[in-house]
Amino acid sequence: MDKLTPSQWKVINKSYEPASTIKVIAGPGSGKTLTLLYKVLHLITVENIKPEEILIFSLTNKAVDSIIENLLSIFENSHTNKEIVHQIGCYTVHGLANRIVVENEGMINIIEEIGWRGLMKLLPPSKRTPHHFRSYKELEKVVKDYKLNNAKNNNPVIEKLVELMDNCKVMTNDDLIIRAKKYLELDSSDSDASSFTQDLRNKYKVVLIDEFQDLYPSLAPLITMICKGKQLIMFGDTNQSIYGFLGSNNEIMSQLDNLHPKNSTTVLKLFDNFRSTPEIISLASKIINRPLAEKQIIDDTDETPSELVRKLPSGVSPQIMTFDDLAAESEFIIDKITQLICSSAKFSDIAILSRTNSHLTAIASILKKYGIPYQKLKSQPDWMDDLRIQFLLDILKVCSLASDEKHNREFNTGDKWQSNFSILVTMSALKGIGDASIQALYKACSLKNLSIWKYLTMVPNFEWPLGLSIKKKMENYTSNLYEMIENDQVHQLDDPMELLEKVASITNNLNLNPTYFQSLSDAQSSLEFKTHLQEMAQVMKVSKSNKPPGISFVKWFLETYFDQTMVFHQSQQALQTTGPGTVKLSTIHSAKGLEFPIVFLTNGSMSNFPMDTNALYVGITRARNLLYMCNMKHERLVSKSSPYSRNIMSNNLFWTYYNKDLKRSVCDVKVTHGYNVQRYNQLRKNFGFYRAYSSLRGCKSVFRRI
């Protein structure tokens, strides 16, 4: 068992009580996640809480993956059957909401970028009207505001779009939360209620929330309903709250703090720091203006200073620098990575964090030029964000939904055709299909109370209100999908690869508008698409392996691919290999809950915006041993470091400290120093770093040889 601190044991040993709250205030690197994991172990092995009575919430898929992986390790190390970990409910809030709604409604659409683009095709073209939008982001905001105001703002165009979304079961993430709450509110004695929904009401006894500071108001209705009457255990740090743009964290925390009586609420604190060096902690404390006096620590906790865990000083302070342009900043980062790799660091030790994805994209292109392997970290898998993959999913939805609807032609259900949305989205991506054609077709379908698919396959084409060239494109669309829908082939194909090949073949024949997606002519973009397609195929195979009887494969996959992606990622954890790895690129928001031995924190030389205090604090506290800060604009930061220092190369004491901290061998640090310097000098000569300043040039991938 891991060596736990007195403050951690206080949390772990706090006994189970129904309708109670334990709030654990835990700073970065305080062992919060480890405490949560051992609390779960304690509940099962000591408190006799069944694993299926425990529910864990986090906000990101990466955090859920990490919790499950670490639970498996802890249960195995404690000689407890690790298979019971899979009986514990561990979800993102939206993942759980999605499962509730799908279980009660069947297939739904969570609207993504490609969906908003499709909806924009239905908007009138006049720029003089109040419903003209320059981007799908503007439309998304207006629709959200319309729903929040309960349709009080008189806008018939938005009203029609929202009606279409409702009829086609198209939901935003906020809609998902509201809809899930509605099903939890239903009478549990209702015989039609689904078992998972009943379990959330009745089975779970303990709910643990990881990173409570990341919660925002729209999540409150669902979370408070689930947690009421159970033991609620929350872990978090208000200094790391960086989702203020989604609403005030204080609002939802006030509801959770008052969920149970005050005499049933306990607040505990973790002040240890297992992660960052004292030098990094000192800078982080300065940023949030928190004094480090031991008196404050003693006042806030029962531990004495000698009981609190702190790492020894490393002797290396964070470096704070300012650069005039991206070239100078990037050259510094490349040069410093060269020094670090030529010492004792691995690529996998290094993370480059920024506030924006656009700045990370610029840095990624430069890393690629130098042959430095990198990986972008995101809140959800890349394949699910790829517009081309989203299009394939929408084609599958068209086929599945339209095939189901053709059996109901005798029923006059008006405009409530769920396939309409996916058809509009996929048609919007076809070359030569403009807004006017989409609007004319949709209006004609509405007048006849037919779905778009039924209209195109039942109404003679001479009645279509479309030009000849557009009619041909529509006929090509229907002819390519006809066999899948009208012959029910989509529900008969049971092999994931056959289904994917069929959908890919259909897509290839549809004459897509290349400007609707990322350019497929670019080699890197094509390679990314191939990678994402392979991952989608793997998730489909996972879905096939656990498909229950009585449901077609395509329907099962489309209803559960969010959950199946989680299963796939968990299975991949055990397959990770050792080696130099990759440099991690991430926004500060996506790096929440993660740590890295070495962090480059960059804001971009062209950014005139000061860094938000909490975001800067989160970025700083991701670093374990080394921190380099580039163009960080903040009132409590002063740029004072020289970007041309090579001192880290010769600091044997630090590299001994570094390798001990990461539990690596330290015997070769001194012996190989001379060779490392020689290797670095050769690399910097190749790259042009021997000058005080140089512009970036096309370089060979020299790093692949080291």
From Swiss-Prot:
Subcellular location: Mitochondrion inner membrane
Keywords recorded for this protein, A-Z: ATP-binding, DNA damage, DNA repair, DNA-binding, Helicase, Hydrolase, Isomerase, Magnesium, Membrane, Mitochondrion, Mitochondrion inner membrane, Nucleotide-binding
Amino-acid positions noted as binding ATP in the UniProt annotation, renumbered to this chain: G29, S30, G31, K32, T33, L34, R275
Catalysis: reaction(s): Couples ATP hydrolysis with the unwinding of duplex DNA by translocating in the 3'-5' direction; ATP + H2O = ADP + phosphate + H(+)
Record membrane topology: Peripheral membrane protein
GO-annotated biological processes: mitochondrial DNA metabolic process; mitochondrial genome maintenance; recombinational repair
Tree of life domain: Eukaryota
Domain UvrD-like helicase C-terminal as annotated: residue spans: 278-593
Main enzyme class: isomerase
Record-annotated disulphide pairs: none
One Gene Ontology molecular-function label: ATP binding
PANTHER family: ATP-DEPENDENT DNA HELICASE HMI1, MITOCHONDRIAL (PTHR11070:SF46), UVRD / RECB / PCRA DNA HELICASE FAMILY MEMBER (PTHR11070)
Assigned protein family: Belongs to the helicase family. UvrD subfamily.
Name the record gives this protein: ATP-dependent DNA helicase HMI1, mitochondrial
Provenance organism: Saccharomyces cerevisiae (strain ATCC 204508 / S288c) (Baker's yeast)
